[in-house]
């Protein structure tokens, strides 16, 4: 599905990504863990074309490095940034409809699915998105991206700053997404969530991957957790 090889990226003269390799297969949830500032968010931005990438990025066998972000989206890559990119003045339903218009007009994920999974969005479908709680806005952002029918969705820190109940709902949503046949590349800070829902995990440090394995592999590797994850 997604194959990234020797990915480099810069902010000015700062060398942020220093040879990142990662793979996401069909129907997989793959999480990227690591401390703040190691390049996890930049990895997603480089794949999406928001940061100029150097290296090889293949999506479904096609090179996408150097394409514009809207071109990459049209090929089937969805992206949910960390800042909960909603249209606050529009209603919940209008936000979801924008996702439909931007997508490929298929039925793998519908507005009805969003409302069924998150009844609070149904209850507040006529409310301005800007008045939703942080957890509700995150749910809306993910659901709106799904309306474009991506084959792969990249999600940056979806549980950041959310209450425990909202975190659980987001975890349930991610599992449901994968069950629908959509691959997920997840940047996540909460180790317990990543271990629970991921098929594979990467740990990132100093702009490169320092671990690639299964949840059981990471649980067994105390040195990686101590060196690269624990504060």
Residue ranges and their predicted role:
Residues 1-231:
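Glycine-rich phosphate-binding loops of nucleotide-dependent enzymes
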């Amino acid at each position: 599905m997604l194959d990234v090889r020797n990915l480099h990226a810069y902010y000015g003269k700062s060398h942020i990504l220093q040879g990142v390799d990662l793979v996401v297969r069909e129907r997989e949830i793959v999480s990227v863990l690591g401390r703040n500032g190691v390049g996890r968010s930049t990895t997603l931005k480089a794949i999406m074309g928001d940061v100029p990438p150097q290296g090889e990025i293949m999506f479904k066998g096609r090179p996408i490095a150097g394409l514009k972000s809207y071109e990459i989206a049209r090929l089937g890559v969805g992206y949910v940034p960390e800042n909960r990119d909603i249209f606050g003045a529009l209603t919940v339903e209008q936000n979801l409809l924008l996702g439909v218009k931007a997508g490929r007009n298929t039925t793998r994920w519908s507005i009805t699915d969003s409302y069924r999974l998150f009844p609070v969005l149904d209850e507040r479908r006529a409310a301005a998105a800007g008045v939703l709680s942080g957890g509700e806005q995150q749910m809306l952002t993910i659901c709106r991206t799904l309306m474009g029918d991506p084959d792969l969705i990249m999600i940056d820190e979806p549980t950041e700053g959310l209450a425990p109940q909202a975190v659980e709902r987001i975890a349930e949503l991610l599992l449901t997404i994968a069950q629908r046949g959509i691959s997920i590349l997840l940047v996540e800070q909460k180790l317990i969530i990543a271990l629970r829902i991921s098929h594979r995990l990467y740990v990132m440090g100093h702009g490169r991957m320092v671990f690639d394995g299964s949840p059981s592999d990471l649980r067994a590797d105390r040195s990686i957790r101590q060196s690269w994850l624990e504060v």
